[in-house]
C-alpha cells in the first residue's frame, strides 16, 4: 500500500496535464426515456404551419421534431393552460423530464384580476405552481391535464370575475351570487370529484384582502373537504388592505376522491382543471431551462425560484436573449443548451451535465447518474486531489500486484541469465 500515495500523485499530475471533463451548460438525458415540455421555441408543429418553414424560429434542433418526446405550444405555458381559458393539453411521459416554458405568463403580460389588483401576486402564484410541478415530476413519469367535474345545486352560474386583456381565469371557477342573497355574507357548497390519476395538483385560491362591494368589505374564505378521508384544506383572508391585493393561490397535491368546496363568505370557488400525475418512478431530478424574453420585455425569475436541488437542475444562458428569427426566437445560447438533447450523458449535477463518468476537474454537486469519482480542487497554493476512495484503493491494489509480478519476473530472468553466464 506504500505505492498508493505515489499513484495518487501521478494521477493528479496526469489529470491536470491531460484529460478534462468539465460540466457543460446543457440539458440532456441518460437514455431515450425522456420528455420535453415547451412553447414556441420547441413547437415543431408551429413551424410546419408557417410559410415558408423556418426552423430558426426554434431553439430546439429540428432533428428532434420526429422524436415523439415533445409537448409544446406556441404562445402558451403549463401555468397559463392550468388557470385560463387559453388552453393547451400538455401531455407527456418519461423518466427524465425537461421543461422549457413559462415565458408566456410574465410581468410583460401584466395580468391582475381587477384594476386595483397586483401582478406581483400572480408572479408569486407562478412560482408556487412550478414548485409543485417540478417536485412532483421528479417522482412521477406522466403529466397531463384533466377536467374536474363539479355539481352546484344552486341556480347561479360561473362568472368571469377575474380577467385582464385576453386572459380569462376559469380555474378555479367563480360561482356567482344567488339572486336571493342581498350581500356576500353567506355559506355555499359544491361537490367535485377527482378520479383516474395517482395524484392531482389543484388550485385553492382566495382574495387576501378586504374585498369591497356596495360599500361593504368582505373577507374571503375557501375550503376543500375530502369526504372520503375527513381531511380539510382551507384558506382565510388575513390581510386588512383594501387595494393592491389579488388572488392568492396555493397548489394542493390531492388523491382521488369525493370533495366538497365550501365558501363561508364572498364567492364560492371550485376547481375545474387539474394536473394529472401518473406512474410513480424512482427519484429523478427534472431539468429546467430559463424561459425569458429579450431584455426589451420584462421577464421574471419564478421558474428559477421554483427549481431547486435536489429535485431540479436549472440551466440558463449568461447573455441577453437575442434571436435570429426575431429578437425572441432562435437564440444561440439557448440553442446550445438544448443541443444536449441530441445525445445521452451519464451524469447530471447542479453545475451542469458531465459527458464522461471517469474523472473531472469539478466535483459534482447533487449528482445523479454515473458520475465522475475524482476532482482537482485548486487552493491558492497547492493543487489537491480528492477521490472516491474505493475505486482508488482497488486500483492501488491492482498496481501493487502488477509491480510484484514485474519484480518477480525481473528476478527470475536475472537469476536465469546469471546461471547461463556461469555455465559458459
Swiss-Prot record:
Region (Receptor binding): 128-266
Region of interest (Esterase domain 1), ranges: 7-127
Glycosylation sites: 54, 89, 153, 236, 301, 316, 358, 417
Localization in the cell: Virion membrane; Host cell membrane
Active site: 40 (nucleophile), 326 (charge relay system), 329 (charge relay system)
Location, primary (coarse class): virion
Membrane topology (Intravirion): 414-424
Name of one Pfam family that matches: Hema_HEFG
Keywords per UniProt: Disulfide bond, Glycoprotein, Hemagglutinin, Host cell membrane, Host membrane, Hydrolase, Membrane, Signal, Transmembrane, Transmembrane helix, Viral envelope protein, Virion
Transmembrane segments: 393-413
GO biological process: fusion of virus membrane with host plasma membrane
Topology, Virion surface side: 17-392
Function per UniProt: Structural protein that makes short spikes at the surface of the virus. Contains receptor binding and receptor-destroying activities. Mediates de-O-acetylation of N-acetyl-4-O-acetylneuraminic acid, which is probably the receptor determinant recognized by the virus on the surface of erythrocytes and susceptible cells. This receptor-destroying activity is important for virus release as it probably helps preventing self-aggregation and ensures the efficient spread of the progeny virus from cell to cell.
Family: Belongs to the influenza type C/coronaviruses hemagglutinin-esterase family.
Name listed for the protein in its UniProt record: Hemagglutinin-esterase
UniProt organism field: Bovine coronavirus (strain Ontario)
Upper taxonomic lineage: Viruses, Riboviria, Orthornavirae, Pisuviricota, Pisoniviricetes
Gene: HE
